[in-house]
Amino acid sequence: MTRPTLRETVARLAPGTGLRDGLERILRGRTGALIVLGNDENVEAICDGGFALDVRYAPTRLRELAKMDGAVVLSTDGSRIVRANVQLVPDPSIATDESGTRHRSAERAAIQTGYPVISVSHSMNIVTVYVGGERHVVADSATILSRANQAIATLERYKIRLDEVSRQLSRAEIEDFVTLRDVLTVVQRLELVRRIGQVIDNDVVELGTDGRQLRLQLDELLGGNDNARELIVRDYHASPEPLSEAQMTATLDELDALSDTELLDFTALAKVFGYPTTTEAQDSAVSPRGYRALAGIPRLQFAHADLLVRSFGTLQNVLAASASDLQSIDGIGAMWARHVREGLSQLAESTITDSLS
């Protein structure tokens, strides 16, 4: 059976959920609690004492049962309270960095059973959730919103800079004057935007119903970013042939694996794209295959763009092709040939106009 992830568990504890309501009642009562979010033979094996309930979950019931010293065990889907006033006896040999008895039991139980375990501290008035070997302190909405709004402001600045360098790259593509440095600058900015977007997305998940407006802002700022990453990888990877889906995914995974420090190093980015890692190589000329430019043509399907790229090889060859040349490609009819030809002409014209404005 697949065990819940930290992200899934945090979403279950977000404002607006029944579990969060119960936890807030416990915090207001300052009684503390230990709650296991799942039940099977592994959980039963570490439970001692207490009593079976098997009643429907309700925040008020959780609050009342938490007044006892023992742990509360919920069903795996969280819909029922299975046991209460239970003493958890996990394997003491499981390593833990926690100092408090309740927190040590919670971390060990989470590791041993595979189910999330929540510890509510009555002295510090905080909620900590343990999932496997991970630990997460549940913050209040005001704290998360303040942090997320600062991150949104940073994301907006990153997005403005990304748009600038993307326009510069598009202009260089039309003029056939692209250097590897131009490409890596855009790649770096795309990845920075993606990473800060992930941080904000985690905050949105934790905010639950309180994060709806933030979700709208995030979706607007990140719209098209993942697609832009895929297109630039397809356009500029050093592979002699257009990338397969597996190769593109592997390249994106390599980008994901770069540390924040490596992301600022163009030689590390160049290595991911299959180029030499020397500083001199960054000023060398490179030619786009044309995926980015063709993606700017309305209603042109990726399959058609891929056909054109595989037939002509580079964007400059596609730009130089006439409508009849385009139509000669198997799978590109007269209508699409005219549409592509007109679209590329308009794209080149608008790019040059933008550079002059």
From Swiss-Prot:
InterPro entries xref list: DisA (IPR050338), DisA/LigA_HHH (IPR041663), DisA_sf (IPR038331), DNA_integrity_DisA_N_sf (IPR036888), DNA_integrity_scan_DisA_link (IPR018906), DNA_integrity_scan_DisA_N (IPR003390), DNA_integrity_scanning_protein (IPR023763), RuvA_2-like (IPR010994)
Pfam families with a match to the protein in the record: DAC (PF02457), DisA-linker (PF10635), HHH_2 (PF12826)
Domain DAC as annotated: residue spans: 3-141
Cofactor(s) for this UniProt protein: Mg(2+)
Gene Ontology annotations of biological process type: DNA repair
Entry-linked SUPFAM superfamilies: RuvA domain 2-like, YojJ-like
Key words, A-Z: ATP-binding, DNA damage, DNA repair, DNA-binding, Magnesium, Nucleotide-binding, Nucleotidyltransferase, Transferase
UniProt: ATP binding residues: 70, 88, 101-105
Coiled coil: none
Class of this enzyme: transferase
Superkingdom of the source species: Bacteria
Catalytic activity as recorded in UniProt: 2 ATP = 3',3'-c-di-AMP + 2 diphosphate
Listed HAMAP family: DisA (MF_01438)
Family designation: Belongs to the DisA family.
Main function: Participates in a DNA-damage check-point. DisA forms globular foci that rapidly scan along the chromosomes searching for lesions. Also has diadenylate cyclase activity, catalyzing the condensation of 2 ATP molecules into cyclic di-AMP (c-di-AMP). c-di-AMP likely acts as a signaling molecule that may couple DNA integrity with a cellular process.
NCBIfam families, A to Z: PRK13482.1 (NF010009)
Protein name from the UniProt record: DNA integrity scanning protein DisA
Lineage, highest ranks first: Bacteria, Bacillati, Actinomycetota, Actinomycetes, Mycobacteriales
